[in-house]
Amino acid sequence: MSDLQKLLTEFAAGRVALIERHEASARTVSNYDFNNTYQYVINREETHLSWLQTALSEYGVVLPPAGADALPPPPPPTRGQKVESGAFRGILDDDARYLGAFVEKWRAPVNAITHARHRNMLNVILGESIEHQRFFEQAAAGFEDLLGRRTGGVPRVGAVLPTRWLE
């Protein structure tokens, strides 16, 4: 296994761990605006994983599982009549911290890569991870207009269900 293949595989395992954590968090965080942010982040992370899969396919390798990089799931969702947005602060803080740790771990190794295409791809992923970290930090601080402002002063009502499809 080449050094680049090893780095790409380990980086991908870390990304798999993050998306698994964010999917679990999205099932827990019922605040509509915060959950929309998770959906946006997960969508971008799926794109990142497709890029990594393409890079790994050059070596005949598939995306690895999170394995040792797996992150703990968030606590179970709070149920009740009205859940305050502050109830999700711990989950949002944790997700921001996990993204920050991922970027910190990989910044120097990625910058040392001599393969320009893979280095640039990984730097884009790290840059977007910093953006996602900022989203979660803002949400943890209680800022709900992360992806845009509501029009006409319409109040926030309702919550997101933890399961997409009910049968």
What are these regions (language model features)?
Residues 1-167:
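Iron-associated oxidoreductase/ferritin-like identity signal
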